[in-house]
A protein has these predicted regions:
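Charged, solvent-exposed interaction patches on well-folded alpha/beta domains
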Residues: 1-45, 52, 58, 64-89, ...
């Protein structure tokens, strides 16, 4: 078989030239990261406008204290991983992601732990419980959530009061009407409404060691008690 070496060499040279042109185009059109500065920082916080404790100003301040705020810095020196790890040390941050773009932007995305109840026990403990039933420290920020007072230790707060708060917050009427949970020495539960000069006693929460059944038992208990109370509000008070 006769090989046309001239044609083969031309094709090979074309391939080499094409590869070089592609490389040169991408190489020389890529911004020099050593000279590119961070021109803008976007801080995005999920649910920032609800009951969370995080805001962009606080995040900026935290990074500035650690000398990690990237605005005006060479993009090559911006350590996205270090920014993420620093923000994750906050007890109010659930997840943190940081990324850089070739046009000088640094994007920071955060999700936050959401408080569902504030605990102010008779032993002067003051902390929050989040939506995963875990303790959050007290903070200078305030938010409009239920306060639980009285004879509450941390175990009872995490295991039972958190579930009671969730059950109340799932109903729009009780989320707006109930402002305080009070636990008596025998663990009887009193609810304090925003409107009206009265106390609502609902008794003791059902207790069980079975985690998968505990939440359902408390939901059923609360729904039964509060449905009766709602009927009293609608019919009993209207006839008084």
């Amino acid at each position: 078989m006769h090989i046309n070496w001239k044609k083969t060499i031309i094709i090979a040279l074309d391939l080499v030239l094409g590869t070089y042109l592609v490389f040169a185009f991408t190489r020389f059109n890529k911004p020099d990261e050593t000279k590119l500065l961070c021109t803008k920082v976007n801080i995005n916080i999920q649910d920032e406008m609800t009951n969370g404790f995080l805001n962009a100003k606080e995040i900026k301040k935290r990074l500035e204290v650690r000398k990690l705020y990237p605005l005006g810095e060479p993009l090559k020196e911006v350590n996205a991983r270090m920014i993420e790890e620093t923000l994750k040390t906050s007890p109010f941050v659930k997840t943190a992601e940081c990324s850089k773009t070739q046009d000088g932007l640094v994007d920071i995305y955060l999700t936050q732990r959401m408080p569902i109840v504030r605990i102010k026990s008779i032993s002067n403990e003051d902390y929050y419980i989040d939506d995963h039933n875990q303790i959050m420290p007290n903070t200078n920020y305030t938010c409009d959530i239920i306060i639980a007072t009285g004879y509450i230790n941390k175990w009872y707060a995490k295991i039972y009061i958190s579930l009671l708060s969730k059950a109340l917050m799932t109903n729009e009427l009780w989320r707006n009407q109930i402002e305080q949970i009070h636990v008596l020495p025998d663990r009887g539960i009193e609810l304090v409404p925003r409107v009206g000069n009265h106390i609502i006693y609902i008794g003791n929460l059902p207790e069980t060691n079975l985690i998968d059944k505990r939440e359902q038992a408390i939901n059923d208990f609360v729904n039964k008690k509060m449905n009766r109370l709602e009927k009293f509000y609608k019919y009993g008070l209207s006839q008084a």
